[in-house]
């Protein structure tokens, strides 16, 4: 499965004004809901917060990848959010974030581990990340991932 198959155009938001972790998670959960794969948004949001309580999902270079497995997720999917202004996502993070990818995965199965590994491999390429930050539309963002 290609990573772009886990997105849809409606699950990508660019230039968000979200200013803190709560607003970011709210917006990303709404973007995830565009897939129609969350049977309970509140339960999924609770799963994200529980995962964040274990350890920060801030990666590096302004990138954060919140993710959770939950019974309310019917199939794996990705959502992306790019912020207008970088923010401190978690008090323990070393830097501010402006580029976030949320992975939703069903409770059973391990596809989310493959998704996370492939996404992380892509995000380690600074040129690729710079291209994502320069995109103007969700379609261009998705095309950049697919290139």
Model-derived features: positions:
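Cytosolic covalent-transfer regions centered on His/Cys nucleophiles
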Residues: 1-147
């Amino acid at each position: 499965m290609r990573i772009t198959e886990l997105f849809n155009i409606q699950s990508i938001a660019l230039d968000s004004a979200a200013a803190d972790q709560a607003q970011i998670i709210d917006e990303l959960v709404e973007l995830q809901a565009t897939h129609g794969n969350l049977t309970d948004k509140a339960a999924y949001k609770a799963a994200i917060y529980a995962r964040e309580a274990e350890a920060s999902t801030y990666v590096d270079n302004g990138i954060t990848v919140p993710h959770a497995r939950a019974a309310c997720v019917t199939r794996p999917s990705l959502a992306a959010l790019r912020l207008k202004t970088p923010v401190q996502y978690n008090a323990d993070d070393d830097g501010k974030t402006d580029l976030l990818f949320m992975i939703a995965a069903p409770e059973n199965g391990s596809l989310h581990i493959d998704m996370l590994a492939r996404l992380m491999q892509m995000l380690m390429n600074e040129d690729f990340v710079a291209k994502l930050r320069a995109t103007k539309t969700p379609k261009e963002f998705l095309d950049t991932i697919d290139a």
